C-alpha cells in the first residue's frame, strides 16, 4: 500500500513524502483508516514501528478539515498524553513534521521547566496539545487549559504510565474531556491492568496489534556470556574495566535490580546511574543529560523507562538480565548500531534464563558469538546440554512484558507485576 491510497489531504502527503516515506508501516496501514473513520482504537505496538505517525497523521487530517481557514479561533481539539518529557518532545516533533503544510499549531508541555512560555503559547491558542500528566493537570487547575472542544484524545505508552504511577492522573484527565470524544489508546504491551484501563475509557474500540521487528541489525556485533547468576555484577565490572567500556546502556528486568547494579558499580568507582519508573521526571532528565554529556559512563535502565531514550551514537548495550519476550531483545540491541555506526550487544545468561535465550535464538536466527573465556562461567553443566524451551526464572512474576502464560495466573498476581 502507498500513502496516497489512504485518502489523506495533499498537504499531509507532501509532508510525508518529504520525509522519504511512500509506504505506511503495518501499524500505520491498519490504524490510519480506522482513525479517519472516527473509531476508538486500541493499538498494541512497540516503539520503532511507526506508531506516532499512525495517530499523528490522521489527527492532522481530521483537524485540518475541521479548522479550515486560519482565521478560525484556535482551540485545543487534540490532546496527546504521554508519560515522559522525552516522549512528549519526540511526538511534538512528529506533529510539526506532518503538519508542516497546514495551519495547525501544536504545543508540547511538561514539568521540570518554567511554565511561563507554555502559558503564553496556550493564551495565543493552539490546535494540538502534547502533555505529560502532571503539568497538564497543573495548568488546567490554574485555568490555562480548556478541553471542552476536544475532538481526539490519545493515551500513548499506557503501560509506561501505569508503571510510573500515573493511573489516577490519567483518570482525572479523561474526566476533563467531552464524552463524545474519539479516544486512541496505545501500549507496547497489554497486561490485564492495561486492558481494564482501556475498557474504562474507550467505546466499542477497534484493536490493532503489530508484531515487533524480529531481525537484528547487521552492524551490531552480538556476544553471549553464560554466567552464574550470582556473578553477573562481577562479570559486568570485569568487562567494563578490562575492555575499557564507556557509554554503556545496561538493561535490567526490574527497577530494584537496576538500583542494585548501580550500587555495585559505584562501590567499584564506576560512574553509573539508573533510570526507571520510580524516578521523577526531573531525576530521569538529569540522569539522561549526564549520560549524554559523558559525565556518567554506565546507564542502567528497565525496558519501559528506556523507551524515551534517543541516543544515536551508543556503542554498547548489555543485557544484564535476558528479556522474557524475544522481541524485546531485538528492540534492546537496536539501541546500538544506529545512524551508520557499529555497535556491540552483550548478553548475560544464567542457567535459569537459558530458556529465554533459546527463544531469542529461534526468533533472530543468528549464530551469536559465545564467549567462554571469562572468570565466571556456570559452575556445572553447559549451554549445550541445558534444557531448552521457555523455562521461566523463579522471579519471572516480577518481570515486565505481556506473555500469554499470564492468563493461567490470577489477576491479582498480574496486576502486581505492573504497579
Specify the residue positions occupied by each region the protein language model found.
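Conserved helicase RecA-like core
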Residues: 2-380
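Intrinsically disordered, Lys/Arg-rich low-complexity segments
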Residues: 382-419
Amino acid at each position: 500500500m502507498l500513502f496516497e491510497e489512504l485518502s489523506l489531504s495533499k498537504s499531509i502527503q507532501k509532508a510525508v513524502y518529504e520525509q522519504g516515506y511512500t509506504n505506511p508501516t503495518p501499524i500505520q496501514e491498519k490504524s490510519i483508516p480506522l482513525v479517519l473513520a472516527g473509531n476508538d482504537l486500541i493499538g498494541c505496538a512497540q516503539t520503532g514501528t511507526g506508531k506516532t505517525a499512525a495517530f499523528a497523521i490522521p489527527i492532522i487530517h481530521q483537524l485540518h478539515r475541521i479548522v479550515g481557514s486560519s482565521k478560525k479561533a484556535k482551540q485545543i481539539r487534540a490532546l496527546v498524553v504521554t508519560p515522559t518529557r522525552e516522549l512528549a518532545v519526540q511526538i511534538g516533533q512528529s506533529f510539526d513534521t506532518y503538519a508542516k503544510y497546514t495551519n495547525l499549531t501544536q504545543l508540547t508541555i511538561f514539568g521540570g521547566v518554567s511554565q511561563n512560555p507554555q502559558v503564553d503559547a496556550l493564551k495565543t491558542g493552539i490546535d494540538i496539545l502534547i502533555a505529560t500528566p502532571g503539568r497538564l493537570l497543573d495548568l488546567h487547575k490554574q485555568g490555562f487549559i480548556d478541553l471542552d472542544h476536544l475532538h481526539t484524545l490519545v493515551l500513548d505508552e499506557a503501560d509506561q504510565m501505569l508503571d510510573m504511577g500515573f493511573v489516577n492522573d490519567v483518570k482525572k484527565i479523561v474526566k476533563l474531556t467531552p464524552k463524545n470524544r474519539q479516544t486512541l489508546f496505545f501500549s507496547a504491551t497489554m497486561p490485564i491492568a492495561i486492558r481494564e484501563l482501556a475498557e474504562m475509557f474507550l467505546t466499542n474500540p477497534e484493536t490493532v496489534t503489530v508484531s515487533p521487528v524480529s531481525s537484528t541489525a547487521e552492524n551490531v556485533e552480538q556476544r553471549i556470556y553464560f554466567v552464574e547468576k550470582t556473578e553477573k555484577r562481577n562479570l559486568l565490572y570485569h568487562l567494563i574495566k578490562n575492555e575499557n567500556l564507556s557509554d554503556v546502556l545496561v538493561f535490567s528486568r526490574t527497577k530494584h535490580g537496576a538500583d542494585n547494579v548501580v550500587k555495585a558499580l559505584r562501590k567499584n568507582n564506576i560512574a553509573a546511574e539508573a533510570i526507571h519508573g520510580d524516578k521523577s521526571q526531573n531525576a530521569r532528565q538529569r540522569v539522561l543529560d549526564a549520560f549524554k554529556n559523558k559525565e556518567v559512563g554506565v546507564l542502567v535502565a528497565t525496558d519501559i523507562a528506556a523507551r524515551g531514550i534517543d541516543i544515536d551514537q551508543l556503542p554498547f548495550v548489555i543485557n544484564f538480565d535476558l528479556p522474557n519476550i524475544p522481541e524485546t531483545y531485538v528492540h534492546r540491541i537496536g539501541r546500538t548500531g544506529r545512524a551508520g555506526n557499529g555497535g556491540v550487544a552483550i548478553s548475560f545468561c544464567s542457567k535459569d534464563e537459558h530458556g529465554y535465550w533459546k527463544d531469542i535464538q529461534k526468533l533472530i536466527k543468528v549464530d551469536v558469538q559465545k564467549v567462554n573465556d571469562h572468570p565466571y562461567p556456570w559452575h556445572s553443566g553447559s549451554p549445550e546440554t541445558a534444557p531448552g524451551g521457555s523455562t521461566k526464572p523463579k522471579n519471572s512474576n516480577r518481570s515486565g512484558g505481556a506473555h500469554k502464560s499470564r492468563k493461567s495466573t490470577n489477576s491479582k498476581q498480574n496486576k502486581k507485576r505492573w504497579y
